[in-house]
Amino acid sequence: MKYLVIAEKPSVARSISKVIGAYKHEDGYLEGGDCVVSWCLGHLAEYAAPEYYDERYKSWRFDDLPILPEEWKLLVSEDKKAHFNILRKLLRSKDFDYVVNACDAGREGEAIFRRVYGLADSKLPVKRLWISSMEDSAIQQGFDSLKDGAEYDNLFAASECRAKADWLIGMNGTRAFTKKYGRRQTIGRVQTPTLAMLTERQNKIQNFVKEPYYKVEITGNGIVAESERMAQEQDADTMQAACDGQCAVVGSIERKRKEQSAPKLYDLTTLQREANRYYGFTASQTLKIVQELYEEKLVTYPRTDSQYITEDMQQTMADLLKHYGGEADGVKQVVNNKKVTDHHAILPTLESCKRGSNSLSGDKEKVFALIVWKMQQAVQPPYIYEDVLVTVCCQDRKFTAKYKNVLQAGHTAMPVPFAEQEKSKDMAFPKKLEQGEVIPVVSAEKKQGFTSPPKAFTEDTLLSAMESAGNKEFEKDTEKKGLGTPATRAAILEKLVSSGYVERKGKQILPSAEGVTAIANIPDYLKSASMTAEWENELLRMERGETKPADFMQGIGGLLERMLADLRQIPTVQESPIYNKVSIGNCPVCGKLVCEGKLNFYCSDRDCKFALWKESKYLSGMKKTLTKKMATDLLKKGRTYAKDFYSAKKDKTFAADLVMAIENGRAQYSLEFPKTPAKK
């Protein structure tokens, strides 16, 4: 039997081809024996913008809302049409007995294949390759146990409902709020509640009023004990005067033995959080790196929400620990069949043991080392310690001293790779100290402190907040998935940054002035983290066949009706032409939005002179016009690649990187000639 295989991207297709023997390169696919392998280039087809349903939607009018497609249209982008035509021809071919969906084993991978399959109007029976590793053995095992494609109908339904909900809320909400408030406001099903979390935290920080407090600290015989906080400095002065130079007595010594189990293995969100905490990586940066490690067969499937492995993987993990070092006896700590759905936790592969990680360097080496470290740490014994609370009495006043005795370092003894190790601030308990012991003389000192505001979010803490969003509103046994999914949270953060609503300052991620203004107009139910988290749970139930797509979409429709009804009651604000423009990035001089004009790409701040001119002397000499994509790249990366610069001296075109530098608030260009083209 001859069969067709469609992977998500060329690199995965090549890995599959080597296993099943498709070595012959053709235009857009590989062939060999009884199989042909092609690929999708990621999302080949996306839902069409409103104007493709009706030309009147090219102009934004509140009265046209809501836009509710009766029949959803999928469009293939111009730069992918040629490859789609190859796929369509293959999918319609009568040479094949069936087609294998080899796209990523998850919600989005299912949608990528199904959309292409549907657009091609293919009648081929579908089988599903579902694997958690790109190792040759895993691929072969997957082909030996292909699933019926129909088993994943519910997964596809959940993916389509998610995409349609995002489209309906995004397209209608953005147009509605933009037209009503006279400035462009981007609305998103997950983006808006996330921005609301950031602005709420920022408001608490900005409105926080620090208040002084006072303590008295007494010292004697190696003991340092402190009083409770006092609001009045006079009370602290009185206590200090009463105790200074006096004797004290150890009143009580309370000991509490505690255990802290080893942390679980990495799911994607936890890996992103810790890579941000230890290395400062953004969530999208970590996702990109771990995806590359997966495609290079060094780690297992990364877009997982599980921190466990199944029982049948115990020997595999024991073999990994034997190679990398670790307590194989502790593997049972991370085994839980009930907590593994589509994919187990992220692990290094057995292939990585054979190949080694010596070829890795830089950021890739750090992320791989972090995954190995977490595997080793997860099987370690618990951290066992003793909290000791000592009460000291002086002049009828009570002071306390806190100590911590480490009884077993356990998993905490493993240092984080490539990271500066944190020094413990805990003090060990003085062994000679006994209850009733008299301290002949103590010195007393007044200490002043101030209450502190909440900390600004980092990507580490924001990802944690997104993951746990709405938990308090759910029943105890409810499956909780928070805002977004492990696979989508990084993209949500990047969209907030690129829209100008959020900015990074060091490790902190903060709402911009534009973001604070935008969220102020949005009603609470659109900002609700618990409602959005409940939608994610509905999608999970849909994957299991417990919720009907029609019921989910009816709920989304009801939300749209409520939103538009509420907005109709609000007077329309006169439009601001600047904020009705689509921004292409942030100004490198002042940080405000950069918009496209007729002749240039200009900073929206009228006091800022920064602009990128479409026609400039520098580029005109090489017969080059600055395109929107080039300008976007320059703002984001400081450089852009093009292959049609013209050399008058040689009378031919050439490829190079156009590099931007800022001098006195203006853009200056230069060319660089890398050995390999910069990423577009």
Where are these regions (language model features)?
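Conserved short loop/turn motifs at secondary-structure junctions
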Residues: 1-2, 102-105, 182-184, 255-264, ...
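C-terminal or mid-to-C-terminal helical accessory/interaction module adjacent to the motor/catalytic core
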Residues: 72, 94, 136-220, 255-259
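Amphipathic alpha-helical transducer elements in NTP-driven molecular machines
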Residues: 10-17, 34-37, 41, 77-88, ...
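Intrinsically disordered, low-complexity regulatory segments
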Residues: 1-163, 167, 452-453
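Metal- or metallocofactor-binding catalytic centers and their adjacent structured scaffolds
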Residues: 150, 233-266, 272, 530
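Basic, low-complexity terminal or inter-domain segments flanking catalytic cores
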Residues: 2-4, 80, 91, 119, ...
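Short, polar/flexible loop-turn hinges at active-site or ligand-entry regions and domain interfaces
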Residues: 72-75, 103, 123-127, 148-155, ...
